[in-house]
Amino acid sequence: MRVCIVGASGKLGQYMVEHALTRGYDVIGVCREQSVEKLARFADRISIVPGATNDSDVIRRAVAGCDGVLVVLAPWGVGTHYASGTAQAVLDHAEPGARLVFSCGWHISLDGQDVYPLRFRAKVKILAGVGRLARVVDLDDQVEATRRIFASDTRWTVVRGSDLEEGPSEGLPVWSRHIGDPVLASNRTRRVDFALFMVDALTNDALLHEAPAIVGCNTASALSYSTADNGRREPAAHIESPARMQSWDPYRW
């Protein structure tokens, strides 16, 4: 399988690169020119297309011939349409029938049936306000990006990550269609396993046109409430943790 990873230089992106290589996939990574050095340890095993992920021409070149596209849908910048521009470029240029898997947070809702805890809603509101004020984060643009994905006729999945932490793989996260399901109550997933779920979704047609909300398979809520429908698997092989990125990481991608 030939796979393009959009946003390959970030923490989540590097884990996805590692998982994809472990599966024997041919990997093309997209990242900003100034971030190419973060992929140095993969330089002899992947192809890199440097450039902004919301640059349509960059994405067109990167996804050509790819069977699957993994996208870190980050809401960076205000007024830049970074998330929606990235999503639109992928929707426009991915090969017909390609499997498209996008990452975002729990705050995205596919059908409006999610039930969010008060604390979560307050946190999102504060982070969204501070992010816009500092002109570094635009959650509204990420909402617009996912609206376009949901409305498209492509083979998409939008994976909604919980709060993330570093650490060895615990295995494939469990998932639910809606926030409020008790299986998600622990609100914690290893970042390496978020990446594992993204890569696994490429070949899991049960997730077509779904927006699974995930949680770590060894969390208390998952152990108490998981079923055969949202399944568990053994931990992945050891994956090296990416070098530490910026200290301020509000959405932990």
Enumerate the predicted regions with their spans.
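N-terminal Rossmann NAD(P)H-binding glycine-rich loop of SDR-like oxidoreductase domains
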Residues: V3-R23
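Conserved Rossmann-fold cofactor-binding substructure of NAD(P)-dependent oxidoreductases
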Residues: S47-C66
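NAD(P)-cofactor binding segment of oxidoreductase domains
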Residues: V69-S109, E144
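Substrate-positioning beta->alpha
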Residues: Y82-A83, D140-D141, A185-V199
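Glycine/proline-rich active-site loop of Rossmann-fold NAD(P)-dependent oxidoreductases
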Residues: L110-D114, S152, E166-W175, A201-E210
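Conserved beta-loop-beta element that borders a ligand/cofactor-binding pocket
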Residues: T146-G167
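Alpha-helical substrate-binding/gating segment
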Residues: R190-D229
